[in-house]
A protein has these predicted regions:
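Electrostatic, structured charged patches in enzyme active sites and in nucleic-acid/phosphate-binding
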Residues: 48-217
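Nuclease-adjacent, charged terminal/linker segments that flank catalytic cores
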Residues: 1-48
Length: 217
């Protein structure tokens, strides 16, 4: 498939790492093949030349979406790069937007994959401020949403979840308790029902609490 330009292969690694890993991306002939089968394809050649941090966010997002699609009977739909705020000055697109529904219970989840890239805390704070503005100005019907979505931060590991939450606390970012946390390896679990977490304040301490979410069964 590499020779026929259906896929291209890239390596992620650095001088101080003993291992690298491979990433396979769509190529132009694969796009033509899929379109010939009347499948909608948004791929562009520039998608394969994005910065490493961007590609890692895409991979983390895709891993989470695929895990939910394959393991959760409540999965209804997903939109990649869903527009939450269309205003040019405050434009906000979620990495992914997932709808889960079972019976009369339905939630929308905006997915934010966070990577420890250069200046990642500053970049995260900028995103958090966009989400806060979105929550503060939200009206039913905004971009097709009747209620504010939950935000799911996909972190690199357990420690990273605490680092992300610290940025929120230190900058007084209040997202109305509609925030969940998870990390990459948890998407490999056979069941996802205990893979989302929240930070709770108890006895003057902040604790990380795994949640038992029926919609993730």
């Amino acid at each position: 498939m590499l020779k026929t330009k259906l896929l291209s292969r890239y390596y992620f690694g650095s001088l101080d790492e003993k291992a690298a890993y491979k990433v396979y991306c769509l190529e132009k002939n694969a796009k033509h093949l899929l379109e010939a089968r009347e499948l909608k394809v948004k791929w562009k050649p520039t998608d394969n030349t994005k910065p490493v941090a961007v590609m890692k966010r895409v991979l983390a997002t895709n891993q989470l979406v695929l895990a939910i699609k394959s393991k959760c009977s409540s999965y209804k739909s997903d939109i990649i790069k869903k527009v939450l705020v269309a205003d040019k000055e405050n434009e906000l697109k979620a990495n992914a937007f997932i709808t889960l529904a079972q019976g009369i219970t339905k939630i929308d989840v905006a997915v934010e994959a966070i990577r420890r890239e250069k200046n990642w805390e500053e970049k995260l704070l900028a995103r958090l401020n966009l989400y806060k503005n979105f929550f503060d100005t939200f009206k039913p019907g905004t971009e097709g949403m009747n209620e504010k979505p939950y935000i799911l931060f996909v972190c690199e590991d357990k420690k990273h979840m605490a680092e992300v939450y610290k940025v929120m606390v230190m900058n007084n970012i209040d997202l109305e308790g509609r925030v969940y946390f998870t990390y990459d390896l948890l998407q490999m679990e056979p069941s996802l029902e205990n893979t989302w977490h929240q930070f709770i304040h108890e006895d003057q301490k902040i604790k990380l609490q795994p949640l038992n979410i029926e919609l993730l069964k």
